[in-house]
Amino acid sequence: MPPRPSSGELWGIHLMPPRILVECLLPNGMIVTLECLREATLITIKHELFKEARKYPLHQLLQDESSYIFVSVTQEAEREEFFDETRRLCDLRLFQPFLKVIEPVGNREEKILNREIGFAIGMPVCEFDMVKDPEVQDFRRNILNVCKEAVDLRDLNSPHSRAMYVYPPNVESSPELPKHIYNKLDKGQIIVVIWVIVSPNNDKQKYTLKINHDCVPEQVIAEAIRKKTRSMLLSSEQLKLCVLEYQGKYILKVCGCDEYFLEKYPLSQYKYIRSCIMLGRMPNLMLMAKESLYSQLPMDCFTMPSYSRRISTATPYMNGETSTKSLWVINSALRIKILCATYVNVNIRDIDKIYVRTGIYHGGEPLCDNVNTQRVPCSNPRWNEWLNYDIYIPDLPRAARLCLSICSVKGRKGAKEEHCPLAWGNINLFDYTDTLVSGKMALNLWPVPHGLEDLLNPIGVTGSNPNKETPCLELEFDWFSSVVKFPDMSVIEEHANWSVSREAGFSYSHAGLSNRLARDNELRENDKEQLKAISTRDPLSEITEQEKDFLWSHRHYCVTIPEILPKLLLSVKWNSRDEVAQMYCLVKDWPPIKPEQAMELLDCNYPDPMVRGFAVRCLEKYLTDDKLSQYLIQLVQVLKYEQYLDNLLVRFLLKKALTNQRIGHFFFWHLKSEMHNKTVSQRFGLLLESYCRACGMYLKHLNRQVEAMEKLINLTDILKQEKKDETQKVQMKFLVEQMRRPDFMDALQGFLSPLNPAHQLGNLRLEECRIMSSAKRPLWLNWENPDIMSELLFQNNEIIFKNGDDLRQDMLTLQIIRIMENIWQNQGLDLRMLPYGCLSIGDCVGLIEVVRNSHTIMQIQCKGGLKGALQFNSHTLHQWLKDKNKGEIYDAAIDLFTRSCAGYCVATFILGIGDRHNSNIMVKDDGQLFHIDFGHFLDHKKKKFGYKRERVPFVLTQDFLIVISKGAQECTKTREFERFQEMCYKAYLAIRQHANLFINLFSMMLGSGMPELQSFDDIAYIRKTLALDKTEQEALEYFMKQMNDAHHGGWTTKMDWIFHTIKQHALN
């Protein structure tokens, strides 16, 4: 169920001609051909059509034009009714220029909403109606309850609750101000400028207040009222009454954007205020009437769609209407019959035979040995073979899955056989109603992903490929006399108690008894220390079989070390119902763990629904909205590891998205950006549908963003395909001409920025827009900020639109850098990182925030003449900074450069960020250094002639050292350089203390399909750079050596930069 292709305004045509002939079929049977402008609205076309129709026979049979709407066939081969007649012809995405006039029937409002949802998702909602799978139908119905609850919650306290949804407070997770930030205050006080609009002409008045940083907004408003009324010479009693009367009638808004201080958080907990304190800027806030804000809020009306009233098509046993038996009363081993395969396309000359490889897995772990079919000729792939597995049916865990692949085998004379997977698939052994699968089944398989090293793909998606022209495997499961169900919790608890009492009756000295028996009553002090040591290990460190036995035998004591849970779960034998039942009872009463630890339980190693449910409950209890926003990319990705459509994680994220519009905004884009991926398009499409149904009026804002992005995709496709051989001047002329067209002006102006929904994008500043020189022809776009106080924040908003580059890796790297920055700030390290905005919005399409007043190192070096451009003059960068920051601000600029350079040295080293050259390292006018373009990480560095081009652990050239040491000749012998080194050492050790978090965040991204993040082996690079097998002292010594290599090997970086500069000059 893939989303629509972006094929232009008509099928296979990027842009309609300025005038186009449209054939219109009238209800009286007449076909009228109209010449229409491509930008014409439907209401204009209808008016012209009915004027023209009077010249044709049978016109008297027609009713008034207002009785009709247009209908046509779109590029998705769907029949669409066009209720919104303000839409333009060029935006209808017609298959052919043909319109039919009809009288509308059915529920008009629901049809309009379905169209809007379909446009936002990128596929018609009616496709979900046609899916016969009862799991899909039940999910669509049941998830509406979550939507209804969230909408009711938003309307709980009327206008204030709605305002909190639309403008959620943008606050830090903790009210505590780090010491180094507090030290920037004057005795704990901050100066705030309060602005008031005093006339209809937007005349402004300001009041400067000095207040305690931990004041709540109401106290700031009270102080502003006191200051405003000072000239009125009120008595203290009158003043008190005045404050009481007006204090609750106003709110504070950040000048220049749509951010409001609606809750009673300390002022310095609001991110805007904290940022101002850090940067030494004066916060500018606007005083506005609450009623003025409340009156602008849309009234959301949630109505249940018609499909909610349909009767479930689930089979009788799913509804509990037929006899069932427990899985645990079956007394046979698992077996599966492989029948035959179709659509297996192979080259008969290259391949001798094919066979089917199968395995029973729990997450990435096999529950028994894999089993293969016989080998057969690829011309006749039939087996009709029963495969027997070394596991009893009662021992199957709830998340067991059958993994299959059709494999080819090629044998060369005297050489080892070559086995290669041709296609793969996975099947859950229990369906969403806890029922064991049975009977015959046809499974359409998936193409083998890049980088798959094994013959099976156990952590891949379950279920059939929607593309029916792929290899298809027919198989058969055993039938039983009754429907077989996984036991419920009461049966599991009963079995666990029996299992524990049976264990207690054994004598530990009895020969041959397992060393996994519970031994909590004989726990020694060194055993406790060993358990504590295991609990602190990173998620990638291997647990030996002996350690697994040790953990399991002390499982009851483990409850006193809650964070050991992931390790204990890995020690469970998931092919033993005795152990699984006991583990379920332990998890049921396990103490909550921190959200960052709970997230580990959501990766591919922990597929069990009860375990994942425990993790979600920990997130519900302790994860703040700020932290949720921070980790949202990963939480969306691990939805792929959920067994079924309806699960606790889906419900948790959906509820959060529907009660916090900022979270909802990014939730929408993270899901939509993967709708081209067939493995998740159904799951993500259904979730997007439910979000769009209940997000209220924000759906219209999202559709404005989607429309703008589609226009830009179409434009850049033309530039890359039809105009690629034209000169820059001709391309620019085309761009400006297109953007001046009415439909482009409508679509590309006056919408919320996808990068930050608190920022409005006003009118396009066409004279400032340009096509960038790189191969994918990115667009540099510039919008006015329409906020009436824009001059106090920024007056224009610049964004780079990219079509053709996968920005997911950039987005992940910038997120990790942002988290590193937070860790450093909380530990008193102000390293001034600059994780600019970046958002992937589709298949190799995305947006990047332009950082103001910044220049690449190459641009700066080129300003230093030929010597500087060719890197021979290492003083160019220092001189440029000196010229930009004269007098007293020079020291501050050098300090800022030093701090940011230290931060990026540590971050790029730990993450193995490659392809570093003077075009992707930038410096702001005030001295702040930052990196851009993160196409290579985890040590996947560019190669030249088979060798890694970069030979140093991170970039620390002579140019940087000269700036850090304020121009000294012997840079590394200065006090400034020593201070820089100390910053790097502290920063490195601070991140090392949080190694588990970073490993978990990368592990959760394994399902993303990023080329450089394919396996745990890739993530192991972080273990290496953080030296997690060493003591802290040894790790620091290791990092010191890397740092030494960096500044002594700086000349190799310089050589790379020289060649990069020469290449860039040749291209330009």
UniProtKB/Swiss-Prot annotation:
Residues 16-105 form the PI3K-ABD domain. Residues 931-957 are annotated as: Activation loop. Changing H1065Y: Found in brain tumors; uncertain significance. Its EC number is 2.7.1.137, 2.7.1.153, 2.7.11.1. GO terms for cellular component: cytoplasm; cytosol; intercalated disc; lamellipodium; perinuclear region of cytoplasm; phosphatidylinositol 3-kinase complex; phosphatidylinositol 3-kinase complex, class IA; phosphatidylinositol 3-kinase complex, class IB. CDD domains: C2_PI3K_class_I_alpha, PI3Ka_I, PI3Kc_IA_alpha. Residues 187-289 form the PI3K-RBD domain. Residues 765-1051 form the PI3K/PI4K catalytic domain. Pathway: Phospholipid metabolism; phosphatidylinositol phosphate biosynthesis. Changing H1047Y: In MCAP; also found in an endometrial carcinoma sample. Changing T1025N: Found in a glioblastoma multiforme sample; uncertain significance. The avian sarcoma virus 16 genome encodes an oncogene derived from PIK3CA. The PI3K-ABD domain and the PI3K-RBD domain interact with the PI3K/PI4K kinase domain. The C2 PI3K-type domain may facilitate the recruitment to the plasma membrane. The inhibitory interactions with PIK3R1 are mediated by the PI3K-ABD domain and the C2 PI3K-type domain with the iSH2 (inter-SH2) region of PIK3R1, and the C2 PI3K-type domain, the PI3K helical domain, and the PI3K/PI4K kinase domain with the nSH2 (N-terminal SH2) region of PIK3R1. Belongs to the PI3/PI4-kinase family. This is Phosphatidylinositol 4,5-bisphosphate 3-kinase catalytic subunit alpha isoform. It comes from Homo sapiens. The gene is PIK3CA.
